[in-house]
Design a protein with these regions (language model features):
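Active-site acidic catalytic loop and adjacent metal/ATP-binding pocket
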Residues: 39-84
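Short amphipathic alpha-helical segments and their helix-coil junctions
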Residues: 38-39, 67-71, 105-123, 162-169
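Short amphipathic alpha-helical signal-transduction/dimerization elements
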Residues: 1-2, 94, 116, 167
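Active-site catalytic-loop/activation-segment of kinase and kinase-like phosphoryl-transfer enzymes
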Residues: 1-44
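Surface-exposed helix-capping loop/turn segments at secondary-structure junctions
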Residues: 2-11, 119-120, 145-146, 170
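Active-site activation/catalytic loop segments of kinase-like enzymes and analogous catalytic loops
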Residues: 83-119, 129-148
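Short, solvent-exposed segments of well-ordered alpha helices
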Residues: 49, 77-80, 95, 120-127
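ATP/Mg2+ or Mg2+-diphosphate-binding catalytic cores
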Residues: 22-32, 135-170
Length: 170
């Protein structure tokens, strides 16, 4: 249903690989302990013809099931690429930070089979590493600035999972 919502008036998020990667760079530059992993190369990809109202934190904000499934907690809505919401659902770091298990390969395959949108699957495959780089940067930064050792540990675990998720696709 959110796909038919008019996104006019909401903040606009980055839409190109280079811009998304640059946002990750901005997080990593603040960190003392930078990962040894390499920055993905930007892939040329056109901006979607239709921009969407996106949630930006889907994974842990779905309640209900089937036709009653709802997105709650709309703290950071934006105008952007629907693939960003797909990313926040599939990302291992988002799941870890939400204190949920990472999705299995079988669950991810089931997601794509159920969605039945090969066009989005292709687009996502081009953007995934950039989204993962940006969120890995966020996790690295948060792991360094927070005081709670348990939460910092969760961010470090999320960082390592996200870098692996990025590498699996680069």
């Amino acid at each position: 249903r959110k796909e038919v919502a008019d996104p006019t008036g909401f903040r606009r998020v980055s839409l190109t690989c280079e811009d998304i990667l640059s946002e990750g760079d901005e997080f990593f530059v603040r960190c003392k302990n930078k990962p040894k992993e390499f920055r993905p190369h930007p892939i040329a990809i056109s901006v979607p013809e239709k921009l969407s109202l996106i949630h930006t934190d889907v994974g842990v904000n779905l309640v209900g099931s089937g036709g009653g499934l709802r997105l709650i907690d709309w703290q950071c809505p934006a105008v952007g690429d629907i693939c960003e919401d797909i990313y926040s659902f599939l990302s291992p770091a988002f799941q870890i930070l939400g204190e949920r298990p990472q999705l299995s390969g079988e669950q991810i395959k089931s997601f794509w089979d159920t969605l039945d949108r090969p066009d989005l699957a292709r687009r996502y495959s081009k953007l995934r590493a950039a989204f993962a780089w940006r969120f890995a940067g966020y996790c690295a930064w948060r792991a360094e600035i927070l005081d709670d050792t348990d939460i910092c540990g969760r961010y470090r675990f999320a960082l390592s999972a996200e870098l692996k998720y990025m590498e699996d696709f680069v």
